[in-house]
Amino acid sequence: MHSPPLPPRPRARLLITGLVCSSLSLVLLVLVAVRWSPLMSLDTTVAESLHRDAVTEPGLVHVNRVLTDWVWDPWTMRVLTAVVVIALWWRGSRLLAGWVAATSLLATLVQQGLKAAVGRERPRWLDPVDSAHYAAFPSGHVMTAVVTCGLLMWLLRLHGAQQALWWGALVLAVISVAGVAFTRVYLGVHWLSDVVGGVLLGGAVVALSAAVYAQRTRWPAGTGESPL
């Protein structure tokens, strides 16, 4: 169903959000790359504080590992995205389905590319409570969660979801992103700046993708249809 174009203001907000997140991401990236002393000190302080607690709380560690390895795992998020893409394609929204899939893929490429480029080491412990491989910055778990939740929130808004549904989804999205960010630092496999970078980069990818889509398609803010 075609409706009047999306007003310029929402498109402008998306673009501004994307540019702000991109700029902050770039600043953080540079600070991490040059190992800016105040940031490194903050990362170390937070990591050591949480690790001291983690080694004395095996039950809480187990809960966090279940959450990070199953509930908020990147592959769980990718499966959720794939289900949404298939549903959109099945409903005939093939451009939108492709756009969501491409955005998710782009986020993964950006994430892996930056990990390789920065090559930041993860925290190392004599008594680790969990382990992870490859470079630390940005956090893949967090960036994938932000992109997945962000895309779902965008789709709900795009299809005119009821306010109660949209706000409920927003609460779940915030809990998911904050939750996975906490688990990664608490389990000692990421620095605080890694998860902040994941949030900023994920937000930048989603906002800029949505802004470009809105500009190219002139899609309405709400069509009265469900995204699923």
Task: Identify the role of each PLM range.
Residues 1-76, 117-129:
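N-terminal transmembrane-helix/juxtamembrane module of multi-pass inner/ER membrane proteins
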Residues 59, 92-97, 124, 162-168:
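Membrane-helix interface segments
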Residues 84, 127-228:
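Membrane-embedded catalytic cores of phosphoryl/pyrophosphoryl-handling enzymes
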Residues 46, 67, 114, 141, ...:
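Divalent metal-coordination and catalytic microenvironments
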Residues 107-121:
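Transmembrane alpha-helix/helix-exit interface in multi-pass inner-membrane proteins
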Residues 15-19, 68-92, 97-102, 146-152, 156, 167-174, ...:
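Hydrophobic alpha-helical transmembrane segments
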Residues 13-21, 80-109:
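Interfacial segments of alpha-helical transmembrane regions
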